[in-house]
C-alpha cells in the first residue's frame, strides 16, 4: 500500500461535514441562555391571545416542551438515517436535509414577529430532526473517507464540531451579544448561516468511495476519489478490501434493524454500540451542561454564566487533546480512562456540594471537579461512541446500526433532561452518585466486552465478530469477545 497523506481535499471534505456536528452542538446549547426571556415571550404571547396570563404550570410545560421537543426530533431523525444514506449516498444526504435546517431556523427566527409559540416549538422539532440525521451522517461519512491509520483522529473531529457549537451558542447567548429581549430570535435563527455555508461547499466534496464501490459498483470513480483524498496512486489494497466486502454484501439481503439483534454476528457489536452511546449520555455530562449555571450558582460563583463558558472552553481543548491521543492510546483505553476519571470527579462533586456551606474552599473544589469531569469526558466518552459504531460494522449493516445507536443516544439524552431536575430536587447533592454508579458499570463493560479497533480495517473487525459468533453458536452460549487478541492490520505510513 502506498504512503497516505493528509491532503487538502481530505481536510476540506471533513471540515465541511463537521458543520453538521457544529449544528448539533449549537442547537443543543442555544436554548439555555435565553430561558427567562423566552418564558416571558411565551407568557406575553398567550396573554395577548387569551386576554389572561397562562398558569405557571402551563408556562413551565410549554418551556419544557420547547426544550424537550428537540430531543424527540433527534430520536426520529437518527432512526431515519438508513432511509437517506442507502438511497442518496452520504454526501447528498447531508445536502438534502439542510432544507430541514433552513425551515427550522426560519420558524424559530420568525416566531416573535409572528407572535407564535407554536412556531417556536415546531422549529425546535424540525431542527431536532435535522440534528438527529446529522449524528448519523457525519461520523459515517468521515469514517468512510478517512485512512485506516487516522480514522480515529478524524472521527474525533465530529465531537470537536459538537463542542465548538455548544461553546459558540454559550458565547452568542450572552445578553450583550444575542441573548437579549430584542435579539434572541436571531440567536435561534443563526443556525441558517452555517447551513448555507455547508450547502455551498458540499457539491465540491466527494461522495464516500465505499458507498460508490460497494453500493453502486462504481469502482473507477471510487479509486479516483481515494487517490485524490489520500494523496497516493496505490490504493489497490483498499479497493480490494472494498470489493471483498461488496462480494459478501451481494450474498446477503439488506440488513434491517431487527436483524441486527437476530443475527448472531451483528448482535454483540450492536449491543456494544448501544451501551457505548448510553455511557456518553448517562455519564452525567448533559446534566452538568444543562444545569451548569445553577450548579455554579449553588457552588457560590458570582457570575455562573462565565464559569459555564469556561467549562465549554475546557470541553473544546480536551477534545483537541483526544484527537492526538486516540490513534496512540487506542479507543478502548481512552474510553476507560475517561469513565474512571469521571467517576472520581462525580464523587468529588457530591462531597464538595455537601460540604460547601461548612467550608469556604469547597466551592472551588466543586468547580475544579466539574472542569476535570468535562476534561475526562472529552478524553473518551465524548468522541469515541460516535465513530466506533461505524468501525464495528461493515457497509451493509452500518446504516441500520448508526440509526439504532443514534436513537439510543438521543433517547437517553431526552430522559436525562426530563428526569434530572426531579432527581436533583429529591436527592440534592447526592444526585451525582447515580451517575457514579453508571460510570463504574460502563467502565466494567468496556473492560470486558469492548474490542480495540485502532489500526484495523472494517473487514478485519467484521471477521473477528463473525468468528466469535460462530464459536458461540457451536458452543450453544454467548462467546467472549476476542477481537482484542487479533493482530491489527499492518499500519500504513501517513504523512501529515
From Swiss-Prot:
InterPro entries documented for this protein: Glc_transpt_3 (IPR002945), GLUT (IPR045263), MFS_dom (IPR020846), MFS_sugar_transport-like (IPR005828), MFS_trans_sf (IPR036259), Sugar/inositol_transpt (IPR003663), Sugar_transporter_CS (IPR005829)
Positions in the Extracellular compartment: 33-64, 112-118, 175-183, 291-304, 353-363, 421-429
Any single Pfam family the record assigns to this protein: Sugar_tr
A GO term for molecular function: D-glucose binding
Signal sequence segment: none
Positions bearing carbohydrate: 43
Protein name from the UniProt record: Solute carrier family 2, facilitated glucose transporter member 3
Regulation: Deoxyglucose transport is inhibited by D-glucose, D-galactose and maltose. Galactose transport is inhibited by D-glucose and maltose.
Gene name, Swiss-Prot/TrEMBL: SLC2A3
Membrane topology reported for the UniProt record: Multi-pass membrane protein
Subunit structure: Interacts with SMIM43; the interaction may promote SLC2A3-mediated glucose transport to meet the energy needs of mesendoderm differentiation.
Reactions listed under catalytic activity: D-glucose(out) = D-glucose(in); D-galactose(in) = D-galactose(out)
Domain remarks: Transport is mediated via a series of conformation changes, switching between a conformation where the substrate-binding cavity is accessible from the outside, and a another conformation where it is accessible from the cytoplasm.
Residues spanning the membrane: 11-32, 65-85, 91-111, 119-142, 154-174, 184-204, 270-290, 305-325, 332-352, 364-389, 400-420, 430-450
Modified residues (Phosphoserine): 475, 485
Keyword match Cell membrane: yes
Annotated D-glucose binding sites: 159, 280-281, 286, 315, 378, 386
Biological role: Facilitative glucose transporter. Can also mediate the uptake of various other monosaccharides across the cell membrane. Mediates the uptake of glucose, 2-deoxyglucose, galactose, mannose, xylose and fucose, and probably also dehydroascorbate. Does not mediate fructose transport. Required for mesendoderm differentiation.
Cell compartment(s), UniProt: Cell membrane; Perikaryon; Cell projection
Cytoplasmic face of the membrane: 1-10, 86-90, 143-153, 205-269, 326-331, 390-399, 451-496
GO cellular component, one term: cell projection
Entry-annotated residues carrying Phosphothreonine: 232, 492
Keywords associated with the record: Cell membrane, Cell projection, Glycoprotein, Membrane, Phosphoprotein, Sugar transport, Transmembrane, Transmembrane helix, Transport
GO terms (BP aspect): D-glucose import; D-glucose transmembrane transport; dehydroascorbic acid transport; galactose transmembrane transport
Amino acid at each position: 500500500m502506498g504512503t497516505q497523506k493528509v491532503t487538502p481535499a481530505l481536510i476540506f471534505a471533513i471540515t465541511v461535514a463537521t458543520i453538521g456536528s457544529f449544528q448539533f452542538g449549537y442547537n443543543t446549547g442555544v436554548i439555555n441562555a435565553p430561558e427567562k426571556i423566552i418564558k416571558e415571550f411565551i407568557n406575553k404571547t398567550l396573554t395577548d391571545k387569551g386576554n389572561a396570563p397562562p398558569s405557571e404550570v402551563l408556562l413551565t410545560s410549554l418551556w419544557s416542551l420547547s426544550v424537550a421537543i428537540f430531543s424527540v426530533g433527534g430520536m426520529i431523525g437518527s432512526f431515519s438515517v438508513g432511509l437517506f444514506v442507502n438511497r442518496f449516498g452520504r454526501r447528498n444526504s447531508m445536502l438534502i436535509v439542510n432544507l430541514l435546517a433552513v425551515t427550522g431556523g426560519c420558524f424559530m427566527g420568525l416566531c416573535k414577529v409572528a407572535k407564535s409559540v407554536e412556531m417556536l416549538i415546531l422549529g425546535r422539532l424540525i431542527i431536532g430532526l435535522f440534528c438527529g440525521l446529522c449524528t448519523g451522517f457525519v461520523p459515517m461519512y468521515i469514517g468512510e473517507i478517512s485512512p485506516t491509520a487516522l480514522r480515529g483522529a478524524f472521527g474525533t473531529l465530529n465531537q470537536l464540531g459538537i463542542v465548538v457549537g455548544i461553546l459558540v451558542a454559550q458565547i452568542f447567548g450572552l445578553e450583550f451579544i444575542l441573548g437579549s429581549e430584542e435579539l434572541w430570535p436571531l440567536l435561534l435563527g443563526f443556525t441558517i448561516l452555517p447551513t448555507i455555508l455547508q450547502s455551498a461547499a458540499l457539491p465540491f466534496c466527494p461522495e464516500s468511495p465505499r458507498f460508490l464501490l460497494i453500493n453502486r459498483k462504481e469502482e473507477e470513480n471510487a479509486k479516483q476519489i481515494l487517490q485524490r483524498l489520500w494523496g497516493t496512486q496505490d490504493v489497490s489494497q483498499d479497493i480490494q478490501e472494498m470489493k471483498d466486502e461488496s462480494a459478501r454484501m451481494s450474498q446477503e439481503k439488506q440488513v434491517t434493524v431487527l436483524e441486527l439483534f437476530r443475527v448472531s454476528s451483528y448482535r454483540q457489536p450492536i449491543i456494544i454500540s448501544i451501551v457505548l452511546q448510553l455511557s456518553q449520555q448517562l455519564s452525567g455530562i448533559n446534566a452538568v451542561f444543562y444545569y451548569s449555571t445553577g450548579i455554579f450558582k449553588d457552588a457560590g460563583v458570582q457570575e455562573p454564566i462565565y464559569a459555564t463558558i469556561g467549562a465549554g472552553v475546557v470541553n473544546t481543548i480536551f477534545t483537541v487533546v483526544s484527537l492526538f491521543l486516540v490513534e496512540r492510546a487506542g479507543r478502548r483505553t481512552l474510553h476507560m480512562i475517561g469513565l474512571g476519571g469521571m467517576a472520581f470527579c462525580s464523587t468529588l462533586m457530591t462531597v464538595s456540594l455537601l460540604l460547601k456551606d461548612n467550608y469556604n474552599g469547597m466551592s472551588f473544589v466543586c468547580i475544579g471537579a466539574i472542569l476535570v469531569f468535562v476534561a475526562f469526558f472529552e478524553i473518551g466518552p465524548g468522541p469515541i461512541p460516535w465513530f466506533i459504531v461505524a468501525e464495528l460494522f461493515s457497509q451493509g449493516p452500518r446504516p441500520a446500526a448508526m440509526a439504532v445507536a443514534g436513537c439510543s443516544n438521543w433517547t437517553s439524552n431526552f430522559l436525562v433532561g426530563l428526569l434530572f431536575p426531579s432527581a436533583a430536587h429529591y436527592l440534592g447533592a447526592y444526585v451525582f452518585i447515580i451517575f457514579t454508579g453508571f460510570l463504574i458499570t460502563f467502565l466494567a463493560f468496556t473492560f470486558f466486552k469492548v474490542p480495540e479497533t485502532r489500526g484495523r480495517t472494517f473487514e478485519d473487525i467484521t471477521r473477528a465478530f463473525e468468528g466469535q459468533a460462530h464459536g458461540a453458536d457451536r458452543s450453544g452460549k454467548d462467546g467472549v469477545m476476542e477481537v482484542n487478541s487479533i493482530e491489527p492490520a499492518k499500519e500504513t505510513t501517513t504523512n501529515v
